[in-house]
Amino acid sequence: MRERNNLIARMSLPTRRQVISGAVVAFGGAALGLTGARAGAEEEISHTAESIHQEPVFKASRKRVYEALTDAKQFEKIVQLSAAMKSGMAPGAKPAEIGRGAGGAISLFGGYVTGRQLELVPNVRIVQAWRAGGWDPGDYSIAKFELVEQGSGTKIVFDHSAFPKGKAEHLAEGWKINYWEPLEKFLS
């Protein structure tokens, strides 16, 4: 796997209300069931937060990468190869759940990561409302995986934004050791 510079940038982000409202619009006005997020959406506090940009490259087709990230059984095998599993963070007591459609729930790494699928374009894009255990109720970030054909492989143009301040370095390392490195092993 080759990875371009891991970029952590400061940028102005929408308020929680704008993010959640946008997600509701994306589902034709249907509520997502993000109870904490809706409750937290009452705050109209604009803020500046960090974001993460990574571009890992894999020796696999876009279809294969997309399936590995959206199929619970395949993703559970990735979890087994991850640093989280080795550290005991993801004991595997609760198997991965990955909703296959927009609005579907996700629960990964033994329930440590939870959220909703916001957009799924097969073999092209995955956008998730994503949160880690220990975050304040209602704190959801946006994780976007754009799958780009690169030669005989696939580059994931990955952007993670709207997460709590001070979490960028920890999250950037987490994506590397819990997603990209085990995904590379799984796909090889």
Segments the model singles out, each with a brief description of its role:
Residues K73-Y112, N123:
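Short beta-edge strand/loop motif at the mouth of beta-sheet-based domains
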Residues V65, F75, I106, Q117, ...:
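Hydrophobic pocket/interface hotspot
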Residues P14-T35:
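N-terminal export leaders
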Residues L34-A68, E97-G99:
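C-terminal segment of N-terminal export signals and the immediately downstream linker at the start
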Residues A49-E55, R62, Y112, R125, ...:
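Intrinsic-disorder/low-complexity, polar/charged segments enriched in Ser/Thr/Lys/Arg/Asp/Glu/Gln
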Residues M1-P14, A26-F27:
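N-terminal secretory signal peptides
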